[in-house]
Amino acid sequence: MKFTKFFSFLLVVVMMFSFTTSTTLAASSSKTVTSRDTMSLTLAQQTSGDSSVATFNFSGLPSDAVVTKVVVDANSGLTYGGNGAIVSNRVHIKNDSMDNYTSAPWGSLNKTEITTGVIGQPAAGTWSIYYNGTNVSILAGSSWKKYSSPKLTVYYNYE
């Protein structure tokens, strides 16, 4: 008698787990590339402008890899000088398959996560970035700011 009750209880538990639905999320992969380029910007007092472009080669990724987000990390090679302070405003990014750049506000600690405009884009290919900055100084003369060897991490899934 005890065996049948135990077996019935066990059967009910197994049935409960077999009828519940579970959600599985696709694992996201990522690749980080360091650019050999420097994003540099020189500005006169109280002016804004765009830096030079840094490029990243992601040609080794599978052709069916699509972007879920990208992260720009410009923290490692920051140098600046001159008569003022240049504030980084926005980072602009595109890859080979995009007609135009998309942008996002510059992130804290020089790291910027971008999803808008890049989700669903092919991950493979050449990516390009630059930043927009403003010299907030009231001192006469110009200032410069450089981000050497920025890093770009592309997070992707497969179609």
Sequence positions of predicted segments:
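Cysteine-clustered segments with highest specificity for TGF-beta superfamily mature ligands
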Residues: 93-159
